[in-house]
Design a protein with these regions (language model features):
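Catalytic cores of Mg2+-dependent Asp-rich isoprenoid enzymes
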Residues: 1-182, 186, 190-316
Length: 316
């Protein structure tokens, strides 16, 4: 069992202010994520916002316009800051609110901070312009930038006392992170191409005649772009099916949070599957009312119960 502490006996005003900053960053920069974590009790919601704010800082360095050498130096500076957080060397009156909040969160919850080192490693792969020949290659990258986030989040959520199979929770959290990241990659195909990045495996691109890349609102001439998208959608669905085994291992509100976030991405996947070329015309997204429905469904436990029934059928 992975146990999470529900609350600290006292949270000082400077720490609360630091958390407030992180929650503002989360609300402004990650609406899907923010929709999910609003279902959590305050201590867990604050800790998740601290994780997001630190992760966002790392991502922003990688996505910025600085030279590669400067990005690398800044990422290593961020890793040094993480070392200070890990050692508990960030005081609550430090001028960096993200470091203050993350240090407090790591004291309250058993967060495996090494996952943030993995995230930095993954962004360094972006900075170096690495491409991926096979799914196994891409999977390694996805584990760094998304699977690690799943395992970090599990440190905040914890598992339900007595949950059967709880020892596999980190594995399921990792797999669910991969499912979310592959969905992101499909959604952002054109945006990434405009930035000179291609994440889909070269083997898959060649198989469906898409090696020329995606530089406009139409697929490469003569390609089977729909076939490529449907192939990757099936892969993502298999990852979701495995990752959703995490839900019955969590308490009700943590399970609702995960179900809401994952549910939003599953519905994005549905939209992409119905209209593959939509990802070349612009960013596919869900309207607020649909996100609200997903959140209610997650809070009701419908997704967790559905996954539990499927797990029982597989074991039968």
């Amino acid at each position: 069992m992975i146990r999470a502490v529900e609350s600290a006996p006292h949270v000082s005003a400077p720490v609360l202010a630091a958390y407030g900053y992180c929650e503002a960053v989360t609300g402004q920069q990650a609406r899907n994520f923010a929709y999910g974590i609003r279902l959590l009790p305050a201590p867990k919601r604050r800790a998740m916002s601290a994780l997001y704010a630190f992760s966002r800082r790392v991502d922003d360095i990688g996505d910025g316009t600085l030279d590669g050498d400067v990005k690398t130096a800044r990422l290593e500076d961020t890793r040094a800051l993480l070392d200070r957080v890990r050692a508990g060397e960030v005081d609550e009156d430090d001028t960096d609110p993200v470091a203050v909040a993350l240090t407090h969160a790591a004291r309250v919850f058993p967060i495996p901070l090494g996952g943030l080192d993995e995230l930095i490693d993954g962004v360094l792969m972006d900075v170096r312009g690495e491409t991926y020949e096979t799914w196994d290659d891409l999977r390694t990258y996805c584990r760094c930038v998304a699977g690690a986030i799943g395992r970090l989040s599990l440190g905040v959520f914890g598992t339900e006392p007595g949950a059967r199979g709880a020892e596999r929770a980190p594995e399921y959290a990792d797999t669910l992170g991969l499912a979310l990241q592959l969905t992101n990659i499909l959604r952002d195909v054109r945006e990434d191409a405009a930035g000179g990045r291609t994440y889909l495996p070269a083997d898959d691109l060649a198989k469906f005649g898409c090696s020329a890349g995606f530089d406009g609102p139409r697929p490469p001439e003569g390609s089977d772009f729909a076939g490529l998208v449907h192939f990757e959608v099936r892969r993502a669905r298999a990852l979701f099916a495995e990752g959703y085994r995490l839900l019955p291992l969590l308490d009700r509100r943590s399970g609702a949070c995960v179900a809401a976030m994952a549910g939003i991405y599953r519905r994005l996947l549905d939209r992409i599957e119905r209209d593959p070329e939509a990802v070349l015309r612009g960013r596919v997204s869900l309207p607020g009312r649909e996100k609200a429905y997903v959140a209610v469904r997650g809070l009701s436990g419908l997704d967790a119960r559905h996954v539990s029934r499927l797990a029982v059928r597989r074991q039968a």
